[in-house]
Amino acid sequence: MIKVTVGNNVKREAVIIDENTSLRSCLEANGVDYTRGVMHLDGSSLNPGDLDKTFQQFGITEKCFLLNVVKADNA
C-alpha cells in the first residue's frame, strides 16, 4: 500500500491505495478531472498512455503526489 496525495491546484487529499492501481483509476476514484491541465507524478509531467500504468510500474513504493495542474490564461 502507498500514500498518494491526489488532487489539483485547489484541493488535495491523501489516500492509501494498492501500488497495482492505475493512475487513471486513482484519479477517477477521487473525483479528479484529468481532462484539463497537465498531469504530474512527483513533479514530473506525464506522457500519453501513462495514466493507464500502475504506480508500481513507475517505481512508486511508499508515497507520491499525483496532481492535475491547470494554468490560468494570464499565468
What are these regions (language model features)?
Residues 1-75:
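Ubiquitin-like/PB1-type beta-grasp interaction modules and other compact soluble beta-rich domains
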